Amino acid sequence: AETRNFALRDKKGNEIGVFTGKQPRQAALKAANRGHKDIRLRERGTKKVHIFAGERVKVKKPKGAPAWMPNEIWKPKVKKIGVEKLDEI
């Protein structure tokens, strides 16, 4: 599977950033970790917009984490809401 580019869109449809990942969810997790809540990702080269609800929560660091890692880390969570088809980009 190739790495795909997903353009992050705001409510007006402006593309405000690009996140990469093999799956839309992987890109959505990266967007959520930057603090985006309403995540709309358009796959490059298509008219599909994948819609996710994102959040990030503070969790304790995992067992076996390296010593330099802080005790609490941000963990992104996303929930897929659906896919929209655009008439034009």
From Swiss-Prot:
Pfam families: MC1
Gene Ontology molecular functions: DNA binding
Keyword field: DNA-binding
A Gene Ontology biological process term: DNA protection
Domain of life: Archaea
InterPro entries (UniProt xref): MC1 (IPR008674), MC1_sf (IPR036620)
Stated role: Protects DNA against thermal denaturation and modulates transcription.
Protein name: Chromosomal protein MC1a
